[in-house]
């Protein structure tokens, strides 16, 4: 079975906690703090693999977590970083944030890598907090939680040419004729329910990949007849063969069919509608085809190249194939999006100090990515940790915001699930 979508969860490893320790050696009085830093958490990395063809593996395993960093120790010993988790996915997979819809990566080359969840940094040990005014700090940090997100994987076929058209117009027969593909062929609608890929090899050694896209119907852009699934496969193609039953063998008007499918492509994506199109007038061996071909040429001949063919006899297919081979080098590939680690770090580093203050019953609730990270990394069981957290509230403007909202001694504050009581 062909799977082209999967929803998974990924999480980078948490950073290890920093240590609180002091150097205690003979003949070294007042040795000072020696707590080492925690190790960085591992990353989750996707690697494109041309040997994979489907997303079926992600149906059975949906959670991917990298290793956490080890905790720091005394004698300034830093924790070991967590191991990265490498996950192989098929070439052609588009990776999206399932919650925001943001495209994180479009992996189109074998070996291409993208970091989809960064590991958290290790917490600092108390040796990092020594200053002229505090020679023996007893504060350290917990490790930063690893980045986590829900991902939507979409496998878009890496085909140069996509065959589109109503069901039963002969697309499967055409692809079986021009390539080595062996699709299921029968005289009923929706015979093709998954895309068929075939490689077309020319006599001069050139080749290109064609995809027999399952049959579209009117309303496909709204999802009718599995329309969204079918149209999704067309987006990656550079050239479209619009296949028509020119004989009208099922009592359909080929010109009307062309207009309906063209409108479905436009409704789904204007970029897709602007893709170069060759019209394939199939079933020329059936009576009535010549008359319809003349009518089609009169209406569309100035705007499109029309190729009369017969998939049953092979007539006209060679001319069609060579026309496609000539056109493809001049057609640019669809736009590619890649989110790499450095870009991601830059975005994170430039994020402003933002928070939101709301009321929930008796609680003042403070939310925001940065302050929640500080809560998770603070060791509240240590007095120095509490003191440092208070300074963070002041530096970020949260203390002033709470006072402006009328907070009083004894009122309750909640941040990242931790509850505090306000004091002077």
Swiss-Prot record:
Q: What is its main location?
A: cytoplasm
Q: Which Pfam families match?
A: DUF1967, GTP1_OBG, MMR_HSR1
Coiled-coil portions? none
Q: Where's it found, cell-wise?
A: Cytoplasm
Cofactor(s) of this protein: Mg(2+)
- Where on this chain does GTP bind? 165-172, 190-194, 212-215, 282-285, 310-312
Choose any GO biological process term that the UniProt entry carries and state it. ribosome biogenesis
| Sorted UniProt keywords | Cytoplasm, GTP-binding, Hydrolase, Magnesium, Metal-binding, Nucleotide-binding
In alphabetical order, the GO MF annotations are: GTP binding; GTPase activity; magnesium ion binding
Family annotation (InterPro entries): G_OBG (IPR031167), GTP-bd (IPR006073), GTP-bd_Obg/CgtA (IPR014100), GTP-bd_prot_GTP1/OBG_C_sf (IPR036346), GTP1-OBG_CS (IPR006074), GTP1_OBG_dom (IPR006169), GTP1_OBG_dom_sf (IPR036726), OBG_GTPase (IPR045086)
So where does this one cross the membrane? none
- Record-stated family: Belongs to the TRAFAC class OBG-HflX-like GTPase superfamily. OBG GTPase family.
Q: Subunit structure, briefly?
A: Monomer.
Any idea what this protein is called?
Answer: GTPase Obg
Instruction: Specify the species.
Output: Desulfitobacterium hafniense (strain Y51)
